[in-house]
Curated annotation (Swiss-Prot):
It comes from the Bacteria. It catalyses: GTP + H2O = 7,8-dihydroneopterin 3'-triphosphate + formate + H(+). GO terms for biological process: one-carbon metabolic process; tetrahydrobiopterin biosynthetic process; tetrahydrofolate biosynthetic process. The gene is folE. Belongs to the GTP cyclohydrolase I family. This is GTP cyclohydrolase 1. InterPro entries: GTP-CH-I_C/QueF, GTP-CH-I_N, GTP_CycHdrlase_I, GTP_CycHdrlase_I_CS, GTP_CycHdrlase_I_dom. It comes from Blochmanniella pennsylvanica (strain BPEN). Zn(2+) binds at C109, H112, C180. Keywords: GTP-binding, Hydrolase, Metal-binding, Nucleotide-binding, One-carbon metabolism, Zinc. Its EC number is 3.5.4.16.
Amino acid sequence: MSILTQEALLVRDALSVRGLENPLIELNINHKIRKRRIENHMRAIVHLLNLDLEHDSLLNTPKRIAKMYIEEIFSGLDYSNFPKIAIIQNTMQINEMITVRGINITSTCEHHFIVFNGKVTISYIPEKNVIGLSKINRIVQFFSKRPQLQERLTKQIFLALQTLLNTDNVAIFIDAVHYCVKARGIHDVSSTTTTTALGGLFESNTNTREEFLHAIMYCNH
């Protein structure tokens, strides 16, 4: 069993208390066994699609999918993969908005297991803590590597940053294209979905909120 970092535990517990964790169940199965079982199930699915698993192009497809699920696109379900984060005391007393724009995300819609992708803008105003800028990107990537709802993904990143930074002053905006809308069903190739979460001064202070909204508009042009 993997030992989780203090930061991973803090975030996991915060999400659980707020009812924002993915609908997980406890399975005491190691990754090797998980991959083997997923491979077997994928083999059955491919077979039921009348595809020849002995063909060169399909021979290793079930194994590839199992490896991809566990090690890549759903790796965020395992908190042992939570990014290593050093919480830095705000000794420089930074009190201005810090913004990271244009963070690319690729996630998987949990309704159809089809990709959605887009861009994220995140701002925060430090109080006691700051973190390295790249850690914000890594937190975004961690939570995107799950079967997701965009609404939940937004809230998970938002609360994770509030928890680690020990401040309510966090804002997040996600603009994404959902391929369950684009590639099936209504086949709408041009619509996007936006979600926003505002906390602290971003919610209560009009000027702070407008500065964040300006950052979003700048990113989208």
